Amino acid sequence: MVQGSVNLNTERGKEWLQDYVDNWVNFYQKQTDEGKVASYIPRLEHADPNALGISIIGKNGTVIRSGDTDLEFSIQSISKVLSFIVACMERGLSYVLQRVDVEPTGESFNSIMHLEINQPKKPFNPLVNSGAITVSSLLNGRTSDQKLEPLYQLLEKILGHRPEIDVEVYVSERDTSMRNRAIGYYLLEEGYLESDLSITLETYFKHCSLNVTVDDLAMIGLVLSNDGVHPNTDEPLIPKQIARVAKSLMLTCGMYDASGKFASYVGIPAKSGVSGGILAVVPPRVRDQNLPFLEGCGIGVFGPALDKQGNSIAGIKLLRHIANQWDLSLF
């Protein structure tokens, strides 16, 4: 058995995988001091900057958990993947893509510069703030709770429970997010919002404030890896085409303005949030039979110390190492 290769059909192999991940979580946890926790949302700055945890759930039932896996944190921008999926299920993929494009921006996630200088002026993709706010306006319902109910129901089917809103995070975002309000007014002026602005922003702030764990993120990733079908029940929860577009967006746009580097060096669809979470999707692949998770897996990471792009600094390093050692890249 060579490093990075293991036969998962044996208990020894599973123990090796667990020991391997434990060792590298401990190694990268020592590098969390290179980043800083988010402070522009006041509630987030209370997170432990030294925390680091990972959960990997395979289609074959293998589960690897290491580090700070029991900590809850707000999902933040990772929820943009889910709101996009639900909007497409309700309104149709083609309609949603008339309102929001699928192009990377190369700009900060809360920038509006591309809206001002490009024609047409629609948001570049649903994973930046302008796109996610537009998508929130497209969700069916007259109130924020009505708009979010299908998203809650989808998560309940995926996870087996309904995540709760962290009220302190929600209030913190609602009361301090002047940039998102400015983006909202700009989108309203350009005619991209289909709901009242206050309801749209309330919806957006609420779905960004849902509490999750790394296990929750890994399970969401596993369903996406399986093209929207829950591997435990074989129930199709997300239409295949929508799941595939969502994964494509994660690969090209999911890591803010570091998406190109992440795609090049890690090579799997992923979406990060400023709370320190990362949702990653490993599709099935046909390669060396000794490699782990050939059937696909979902990965959830939490490390609130962020780099300059707003991504978990230790989480990205951990994912890059595991992806390289286990040949997880799509390419």
Swiss-Prot record:
The gene is glsA. Homotetramer. Keywords: Hydrolase. It comes from the Bacteria. Substrate binds at residues 77, 129, 173, 180, 204, 256, 274. Its EC number is 3.5.1.2. It comes from Oceanobacillus iheyensis (strain DSM 14371 / CIP 107618 / JCM 11309 / KCTC 3954 / HTE831). Belongs to the glutaminase family. This is Glutaminase.
